[in-house]
Amino acid sequence: MTRTTSLAKLRAPLGGQEIELQQIDFDGGGMSLLRTRIREKSRFTVFDIDPQTAEAWGQALLRWADGQPKG
């Protein structure tokens, strides 16, 4: 049995997509994964990533956001 813990829920203002981040922990131990669930109307996109990929993705998102006009 795996344990799923909700970390954050967001809604994109332009497209209305629902984004949920979840931590996935496996009973046998090992590496936890970050599950990203994106719901767009009745369609779901779900993928699991490792901590290193999550860190690189997060840094890329922050770099992009920091380069955008504020206001």
What positions do the PLM features span?
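Positively charged, low-complexity terminal tracts
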Residues: 1-71
